[in-house]
A protein has these predicted regions:
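Acidic (Asp/Glu)-rich catalytic clusters
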Residues: 8, 30-41, 80-84, 113, ...
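N-terminal small/glycine-rich loop or linker at the start of catalytic domains
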Residues: 43-63, 87, 92
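Beta/alpha (TIM)-barrel catalytic core signal, keyed to glycine-rich beta->alpha loops juxtaposed to Asp/Glu
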Residues: 22, 97-176
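Short, acidic/polar
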Residues: 1-6, 65-84, 131-136, 161
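Conserved beta-strand positions
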Residues: 16, 90-93, 123, 151
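Active-site groove signature of glycoside hydrolases
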Residues: 80-101
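Active-site mouth loops of central-metabolism enzymes
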Residues: 57-73, 94-100
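N-terminal binding-site loop/beta-alpha segment at the start of enzyme catalytic domains
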Residues: 1-44, 86, 174
Length: 176
Protein backbone atom coordinates (compact mmCIF):
# COMPACT_ATOMS: atom_id res chain seq x y z
CA UNK A 1 0.00 0.00 0.00
CA UNK A 2 1.08 3.56 -0.70
CA UNK A 3 0.18 4.59 2.85
CA UNK A 4 2.45 1.92 4.36
CA UNK A 5 5.35 3.01 2.17
CA UNK A 6 4.74 6.64 3.07
CA UNK A 7 4.88 5.77 6.78
CA UNK A 8 8.12 3.82 6.20
CA UNK A 9 9.56 6.99 4.66
CA UNK A 10 8.51 9.10 7.66
CA UNK A 11 5.13 10.49 6.64
CA UNK A 12 2.94 10.67 9.73
CA UNK A 13 0.21 13.23 8.85
CA UNK A 14 -2.82 12.12 6.86
CA UNK A 15 -5.69 14.38 5.86
CA UNK A 16 -9.08 13.22 4.60
CA UNK A 17 -12.76 14.16 4.75
CA UNK A 18 -16.09 12.48 5.34
CA UNK A 19 -17.14 13.76 1.92
CA UNK A 20 -14.29 12.14 -0.04
CA UNK A 21 -15.89 9.08 -1.60
CA UNK A 22 -18.80 9.39 0.84
CA UNK A 23 -16.60 8.20 3.70
CA UNK A 24 -14.58 5.61 1.76
CA UNK A 25 -11.42 7.70 2.00
CA UNK A 26 -11.70 7.60 5.80
CA UNK A 27 -12.33 3.85 5.72
CA UNK A 28 -9.28 3.19 3.53
CA UNK A 29 -7.10 5.37 5.73
CA UNK A 30 -8.38 3.68 8.89
CA UNK A 31 -7.49 0.25 7.50
CA UNK A 32 -4.09 1.47 6.30
CA UNK A 33 -3.01 2.86 9.68
CA UNK A 34 -4.54 0.08 11.79
CA UNK A 35 -1.94 -1.07 14.29
CA UNK A 36 0.03 2.16 13.84
CA UNK A 37 -2.49 4.64 15.25
CA UNK A 38 -0.11 6.10 17.82
CA UNK A 39 2.45 6.82 15.07
CA UNK A 40 0.17 8.93 12.87
CA UNK A 41 -1.76 12.17 13.03
CA UNK A 42 -5.19 11.92 11.44
CA UNK A 43 -6.96 15.03 10.22
CA UNK A 44 -10.44 14.83 8.78
CA UNK A 45 -13.12 17.30 7.83
CA UNK A 46 -16.91 17.48 8.16
CA UNK A 47 -19.74 19.38 6.46
CA UNK A 48 -21.59 18.12 3.47
CA UNK A 49 -22.52 21.32 1.74
CA UNK A 50 -24.50 20.22 -1.28
CA UNK A 51 -26.80 23.18 -0.63
CA UNK A 52 -23.91 25.55 -1.39
CA UNK A 53 -23.25 24.15 -4.84
CA UNK A 54 -21.78 26.58 -7.36
CA UNK A 55 -24.19 25.19 -9.95
CA UNK A 56 -27.51 25.81 -8.22
CA UNK A 57 -28.98 28.37 -5.89
CA UNK A 58 -28.17 27.82 -2.22
CA UNK A 59 -31.18 26.59 -0.28
CA UNK A 60 -31.79 26.26 3.42
CA UNK A 61 -29.75 23.24 4.56
CA UNK A 62 -31.18 20.36 6.51
CA UNK A 63 -29.78 19.20 9.84
CA UNK A 64 -27.89 16.55 7.87
CA UNK A 65 -25.65 19.15 6.26
CA UNK A 66 -23.32 21.94 7.15
CA UNK A 67 -21.86 22.91 10.49
CA UNK A 68 -24.92 22.55 12.70
CA UNK A 69 -24.41 20.90 16.08
CA UNK A 70 -26.69 18.05 15.04
CA UNK A 71 -24.68 17.34 11.90
CA UNK A 72 -21.29 17.68 13.61
CA UNK A 73 -22.25 15.17 16.32
CA UNK A 74 -23.52 12.68 13.74
CA UNK A 75 -20.59 13.11 11.39
CA UNK A 76 -17.90 12.75 14.06
CA UNK A 77 -19.37 9.36 15.03
CA UNK A 78 -19.34 8.26 11.38
CA UNK A 79 -15.76 9.45 10.95
CA UNK A 80 -14.60 7.66 14.10
CA UNK A 81 -16.27 4.47 12.86
CA UNK A 82 -14.85 4.83 9.33
CA UNK A 83 -11.35 5.52 10.67
CA UNK A 84 -11.53 2.71 13.23
CA UNK A 85 -10.28 4.95 16.02
CA UNK A 86 -11.62 6.42 19.23
CA UNK A 87 -10.23 9.92 18.59
CA UNK A 88 -9.41 12.29 15.75
CA UNK A 89 -6.27 14.39 16.06
CA UNK A 90 -7.54 17.34 14.01
CA UNK A 91 -11.22 17.79 13.17
CA UNK A 92 -11.90 20.58 10.67
CA UNK A 93 -14.92 22.44 9.38
CA UNK A 94 -14.63 21.85 5.63
CA UNK A 95 -16.37 25.10 4.65
CA UNK A 96 -17.89 28.16 6.29
CA UNK A 97 -21.59 27.53 6.79
CA UNK A 98 -23.54 30.78 6.32
CA UNK A 99 -26.70 29.18 7.71
CA UNK A 100 -25.32 28.09 11.09
CA UNK A 101 -24.12 30.61 13.69
CA UNK A 102 -20.39 30.17 14.27
CA UNK A 103 -21.13 30.01 18.02
CA UNK A 104 -23.15 26.80 17.48
CA UNK A 105 -20.36 25.24 15.44
CA UNK A 106 -17.64 26.19 17.91
CA UNK A 107 -19.61 25.02 20.95
CA UNK A 108 -20.16 21.63 19.30
CA UNK A 109 -16.46 21.32 18.42
CA UNK A 110 -15.46 22.41 21.93
CA UNK A 111 -17.71 19.70 23.37
CA UNK A 112 -15.98 17.10 21.19
CA UNK A 113 -12.59 18.19 22.52
CA UNK A 114 -13.85 17.93 26.12
CA UNK A 115 -15.31 14.48 25.36
CA UNK A 116 -11.91 13.31 24.09
CA UNK A 117 -13.25 12.44 20.63
CA UNK A 118 -11.21 15.23 19.04
CA UNK A 119 -7.85 16.59 20.13
CA UNK A 120 -7.71 19.80 18.08
CA UNK A 121 -10.09 21.69 15.82
CA UNK A 122 -9.50 23.64 12.63
CA UNK A 123 -11.06 25.01 9.48
CA UNK A 124 -10.64 24.60 5.76
CA UNK A 125 -11.62 26.94 2.98
CA UNK A 126 -12.46 29.88 5.26
CA UNK A 127 -11.78 33.46 4.20
CA UNK A 128 -9.54 35.51 6.51
CA UNK A 129 -12.51 37.39 8.02
CA UNK A 130 -14.20 34.07 8.78
CA UNK A 131 -11.10 32.73 10.54
CA UNK A 132 -10.92 35.99 12.54
CA UNK A 133 -14.60 35.80 13.48
CA UNK A 134 -14.21 32.19 14.62
CA UNK A 135 -11.08 32.99 16.64
CA UNK A 136 -12.70 36.04 18.24
CA UNK A 137 -15.83 34.05 19.09
CA UNK A 138 -13.74 31.27 20.64
CA UNK A 139 -11.92 33.79 22.78
CA UNK A 140 -15.10 35.61 23.87
CA UNK A 141 -16.89 32.36 24.78
CA UNK A 142 -13.79 30.71 26.29
CA UNK A 143 -13.94 27.82 23.82
CA UNK A 144 -11.19 25.81 22.17
CA UNK A 145 -9.97 27.78 19.16
CA UNK A 146 -8.93 26.62 15.71
CA UNK A 147 -5.41 25.22 15.79
CA UNK A 148 -5.19 25.19 11.99
CA UNK A 149 -6.59 26.91 8.93
CA UNK A 150 -6.24 25.03 5.66
CA UNK A 151 -6.47 27.07 2.48
CA UNK A 152 -6.23 26.24 -1.21
CA UNK A 153 -2.87 27.43 -2.48
CA UNK A 154 -1.10 26.51 -5.68
CA UNK A 155 0.17 28.10 -8.88
CA UNK A 156 -3.38 28.68 -10.13
CA UNK A 157 -5.00 29.67 -6.83
CA UNK A 158 -2.94 32.28 -5.01
CA UNK A 159 -5.78 34.30 -3.46
CA UNK A 160 -4.57 33.70 0.10
CA UNK A 161 -1.45 35.77 -0.53
CA UNK A 162 -3.53 38.92 -0.13
CA UNK A 163 -5.39 38.20 3.08
CA UNK A 164 -4.19 35.07 4.88
CA UNK A 165 -0.43 35.02 4.30
CA UNK A 166 0.58 38.55 5.50
CA UNK A 167 -0.44 37.97 9.14
CA UNK A 168 1.67 34.78 9.18
CA UNK A 169 4.91 36.75 9.05
CA UNK A 170 6.21 37.79 12.44
CA UNK A 171 7.18 41.44 12.75
CA UNK A 172 10.91 41.71 13.19
CA UNK A 173 13.36 44.62 13.44
CA UNK A 174 15.33 42.91 10.66
CA UNK A 175 12.41 43.35 8.27
CA UNK A 176 12.55 47.14 8.49
Amino acid sequence: LVTHRAMELGVNFFDTSNSYGDGLSEEYLGKAVKGNRSRVIIATKFARLGHLSQVRQPSRPTLMEGASRHNIMQEVEKSLRHLGTDYIDLYQAHFWDPYTPIEETLRALDDLVHQGKVRYIGCSGFAAWQVCEAMWTSRMLNLNAFASAMAEYNLLHRDIEGELVPPLFVASPCQR
